[in-house]
């Protein structure tokens, strides 16, 4: 499953190769996808290469080869410009007492199947994922009401809040947050990170819980809340 940005970039590269015989420059890709910097293009290119859609040819400038295009199942549901994406899509876990849905291979009537929607960065923001991979079984009384999902934590920027690399973060879907909440924040509609949310005047601060990382101060129009942390699932 490709994200909307990944699909748009792959389509743009493929069309340019057909039209001109050479791939677009990074500046052209940045402008075509309305990104603020070329670092976002580097991340998208790497993601497409890792997924086997493109190949970068060594020792040649601007040498990108499109290996394949996604089939219908690998395309975003809506790839047109102006579409507002959500990093978390699909049917999320809901508590439906008194008969919660059991997780896969789990028949405990007191548990709920919570979908794992990908990985979340507790460190440098990583590209947002939109694919549901599997479910985990969570005690129903941990969740309360509303919709929930889980994200695998990658990084160590929240260790002082007790959130470790490899933990499964349990998230209540929400688009608002109070100061002090630990949230899933979508930055510039393309990167997701797990940080503590605070308001600083007219700006939003995304604070790590590790002195080795810096606080990010961003205008509200660059940040969209995707949910609030309600618990952790950890295997020993």
Swiss-Prot record:
Q: What catalytic activity is recorded?
A: Hydrolysis of Ala-|-Gly bond in repressor LexA
Site annotation (Cleavage): which residues? 122-123
* Annotated keywords: Autocatalytic cleavage, DNA damage, DNA repair, DNA replication, DNA-binding, Hydrolase, Repressor, SOS response, Transcription, Transcription regulation
* A Pfam family per the record: Peptidase_S24
Domain of life, source organism: Bacteria
Which GO biological process annotations does it have?
A: DNA repair; DNA replication; negative regulation of DNA-templated transcription; proteolysis; SOS response
The coiled-coil segments of this chain are: none
Molecular function GO terms recorded: DNA binding; serine-type endopeptidase activity
Q: Which residues catalyse the reaction?
A: 157, 195
Positions of the UniProt region annotated as Disordered:
85-109
EC number(s) stated in the UniProt entry for this protein: 3.4.21.88
Ranges annotated as DNA-binding: 26-46
HAMAP family listed in its UniProt record: LexA
**What is the annotated role of this protein in its UniProt record?**
Represses a number of genes involved in the response to DNA damage (SOS response), including recA and lexA. In the presence of single-stranded DNA, RecA interacts with LexA causing an autocatalytic cleavage which disrupts the DNA-binding part of LexA, leading to derepression of the SOS regulon and eventually DNA repair.
How this chain assembles, per its entry, is:
Homodimer.
Family per similarity comment: Belongs to the peptidase S24 family.
Name of the protein described by the UniProt record: LexA repressor
Q: What is the lineage of its organism?
A: Bacteria, Pseudomonadati, Pseudomonadota, Alphaproteobacteria, Hyphomicrobiales
